[in-house]
């Protein structure tokens, strides 16, 4: 039983790790590249030269640079969030692999660690799509919109556009997150190979019989 259960969880963690790593490292790369690129654009366009005319010199239009500055800060927060709260399914299989399993006691200890890692993976996936994550992202994007409109004295429509753009990126991040560990944990708790302690009750076996004798008959159902 221990071997079968351990094989199930090990296979599940290893199978889910490649896509989890792609999602986690991919979004770190996207957020990092966005933060750096927008930061450079904000710095280079902040003091753009104004065309000199005989009329009074107009105020430089910094709306593009301001948008890039706000976007850079938002993306930097995205990188920080992914680093502070790592995506456990991306590394769980690697953490389990070095543990020995040569004796029954070692296999039992490894199984306990495997179950713990699988539950951590499922919990992290649920948190990543949970209400708290949605509210935190909405708060950051709302703050970015307020800064655009209030701090930079821009129209509120510009603030709404900033909020909507940031929220679209946040939702793409949330709903592209893998959820395999959550499904694997449900399968394991519902009755994986050798997991007799968590298996679902077997359907009761029904038997029927029909008896005939002179003057009558009988029907018997056993369950």
Kindly give the residue locations of the regions a language model identified:
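N-terminal Sec/ER secretory leader and immediately downstream segment
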Residues: 16-69
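Glycine- and aromatic-enriched membrane insertion/assembly motifs of diderm outer-membrane
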Residues: 42-47, 65-89
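Hydrophobic alpha-helical transmembrane segments
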Residues: 59-73, 155-165
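Mid-membrane cores of alpha-helical transmembrane segments in multi-pass membrane proteins
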Residues: 28-37, 70-75, 135-143
């Amino acid at each position: 039983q221990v071997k079968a259960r351990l094989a199930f969880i090990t296979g599940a963690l290893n199978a889910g790790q490649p896509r989890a790593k792609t999602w986690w490292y991919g979004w770190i790369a996207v957020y990092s590249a966005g933060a750096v690129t927008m930061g450079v654009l904000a710095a280079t366009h902040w003091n753009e030269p104004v065309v000199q005319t005989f009329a009074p010199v107009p105020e430089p239009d910094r709306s593009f640079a301001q948008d890039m500055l706000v976007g850079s800060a938002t993306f930097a927060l995205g990188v920080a969030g992914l680093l502070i709260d790592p995506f456990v399914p991306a590394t769980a299989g690697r953490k389990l692999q070095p543990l020995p399993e040569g004796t029954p006691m070692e296999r039992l200890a490894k199984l306990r660690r495997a179950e713990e890692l699988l539950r951590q993976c499922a919990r992290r996936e649920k948190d990543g799509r949970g209400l708290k994550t949605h509210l935190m992202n909405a708060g950051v994007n709302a703050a970015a919109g307020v800064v655009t409109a209030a701090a930079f004295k821009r129209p509120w429509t510009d603030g709404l556009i900033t909020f909507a753009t940031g929220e679209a990126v946040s939702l793409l991040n949330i709903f592209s997150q893998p959820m395999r560990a959550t499904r694997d944990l449900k399968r394991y708790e519902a009755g994986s190979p050798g997991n007799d302690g968590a298996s679902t009750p077997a359907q009761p076996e029904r038997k029927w019989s029909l008896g005939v004798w002179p003057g009558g008959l009988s029907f018997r159902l056993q369950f």
